[in-house]
Design a protein with these regions (language model features):
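Short secondary-structure junction motifs
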Residues: 23-27, 73-78
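Generic secondary-structure microfeatures
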Residues: 14, 18, 43-47, 65
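Short, non-transmembrane amphipathic alpha-helical segments
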Residues: 14, 53-72
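Short, internal active-site loops enriched in acidic
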Residues: 35-36, 46-47, 83-89
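N-proximal, solvent-exposed amphipathic alpha-helical segments enriched in charged/polar residues
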Residues: 1-28
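A short interface-forming secondary-structure element
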Residues: 41-58
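Polar/charged, Gly/Pro-rich intrinsically disordered segments
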Residues: 55, 74-97
Length: 97
């Protein structure tokens, strides 16, 4: 199934992005939204986001994933992409991210 392959490639691209930027992740979560084949992507970093504004890390991850994962012909749609620190994650814990 093409969707499951795309999701594996998506996770691998996120892991590579973290390595390239020396980010120590504590959580990488790719979960279905329940609407079609759209997914929410959550990346929580233990280290590496300290001096990196949220919008810049979001744009960097978005650009990296789109360059690495060819979703042409796939029905997988990233409806939310959230790279955050552990502190930001704790602040929003319990809130749908």
């Amino acid at each position: 199934m093409k969707s499951s392959i795309i999701l594996k490639e998506l996770r691998a691209a996120i892991e590579e992005w973290a390595r390239v930027h020396n980010i120590e992740t504590s959580l990488i979560e790719i979960k279905p939204t329940g609407f079609g084949s759209s997914v929410h992507v959550l990346v929580v970093a233990r280290k590496g986001f300290e001096n990196w504004p949220r919008y810049e890390r979001h744009d960097s991850l978005f650009d990296f994933v789109n360059a690495k994962v060819d979703r042409t012909g796939s029905d997988v749609f990233i409806s939310r992409l959230s790279p955050m620190t552990e502190e930001e994650y704790e602040k929003y814990e319990g809130v749908e991210v």
